[in-house]
Every structure is written in C-alpha cells, then in structure tokens.
C-alpha cells in the first residue's frame, strides 16, 4: 500500500481527528491505495458503534481514469472489506473540483484533501470547497511544511508553495485558523471560524 503518510503514522492522526471532532458528514478527496480512507473509516466506525452517531464518509478519486500514479477502486474496496470497514465508507469515482457540487453549502463537517497537493491546488480548494464547509468544520490538507514545499516534483515542475498560499490566501486569512503538523509529508489543519470556539485554535 502506497502513502507518504505511512512512515509517520498519519493514519492514527486522521482517525483521532474523526473521533474527536465527531463529524456527521465527512468527505475525502484523493484515495490512492486507501491508507487514509481506512483510518478515516475506522474513526467513523467508532462514532457509529460507540457514540451511536449516524456519521457518513464519502471518498472520491479518479482511480483508473487518472493517467498518472493512481489506485484501483476494486482493490481499495477489497482492503476496506478485509478490515471490516466497507459499510462505513462509500467509494466514488469523481474529479476533485467537480464533486463539491454534490454538497449543499455548510453541509460538510470534515474534508480530507490529498491529490498531489501544491499551492495552486490549495487555492482551487478554497475557491470551490470553502462554502461547503460548515462553520466550525475542518479541512485536513496534506502538505504545508517548508520541507514538503521542497520535495523533488514540486521543484522540478515549479509548483506553487503551499506554505505561501497558507500565509497569503484571503479566504484562509479571513475565514480560518490553521496549524501544520510538521513531520513529513506534513498535514495542515484548517479550522473554519464561526463554530464552537473549543473547535478552533486560539
């Protein structure tokens, strides 16, 4: 199973966020081989079985339709079934910047986004998904550390710095507080303002 998250056990962080934040509607964009999906779904399982919540997780990817590095939808489904998590997540094929149209404004509690992220991807995310996140909701975005901005493919293809966008983007500055977990590949956590103050970093 491929994931840059594996080395520093980011899966446990994702699961913990789900359990702590208790989202009713969680969405993931970017699945690859399903590492993050498995851990998010494990969190959803806890919410349903321990807390009696009716939480949902929908995970989107282009899978075989993506010409570069991609996972196979059927294989990811097999992983989920093998872990007993298949009933806690719905895998869907879809484009990252089209499927936001499936959701009403303010309807998403937690969004995990990991699609070869760079600064331009983050800008596009804020333009398209921001209104879909409820006040007090959270966006988990792979990347955000200085080290992550310097990786080989970011430099080779002259990709825009994620960190620069975090510091300068108007929507982020006005509507979110954020923190970055620095261990590679890093994870940016953006808390949308306006909800319960205990859900935001001061």
Task: Provide a role label for each language-model segment.
Residues 1-11:
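Conserved SAM-binding loop and adjacent beta-strand
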């Amino acid at each position: 199973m491929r994931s840059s998250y594996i080395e520093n056990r980011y899966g446990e962080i994702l699961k913990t966020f789900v359990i702590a934040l208790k989202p009713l509607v969680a969405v993931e964009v970017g699945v690859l081989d399903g590492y993050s999906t498995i851990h998010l779904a494990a969190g959803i399982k806890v919410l349903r079985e321990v807390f009696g919540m009716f939480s949902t997780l929908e995970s989107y990817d282009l899978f075989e339709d993506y010409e570069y590095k991609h996972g196979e939808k059927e294989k990811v489904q097999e992983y989920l079934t093998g872990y007993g998590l298949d009933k806690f997540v719905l895998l869907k094929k879809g484009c990252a910047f089209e499927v936001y149209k499936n959701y009403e404004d303010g309807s998403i509690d937690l969004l995990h986004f990991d699609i070869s992220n760079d600064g331009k991807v983050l800008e596009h995310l804020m333009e398209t998904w921001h209104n879909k996140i409820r006040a007090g909701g959270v966006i988990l975005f792979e990347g955000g550390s200085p080290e992550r901005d310097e990786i080989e493919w970011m430099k080779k293809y002259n990709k825009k710095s994620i960190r620069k966008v975090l510091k300068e983007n108007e929507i982020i500055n006005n509507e979110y507080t954020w923190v970055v977990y620095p261990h590679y590949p890093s994870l940016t956590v953006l808390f949308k303002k306006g909800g319960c103050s205990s859900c935001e970093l001061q």
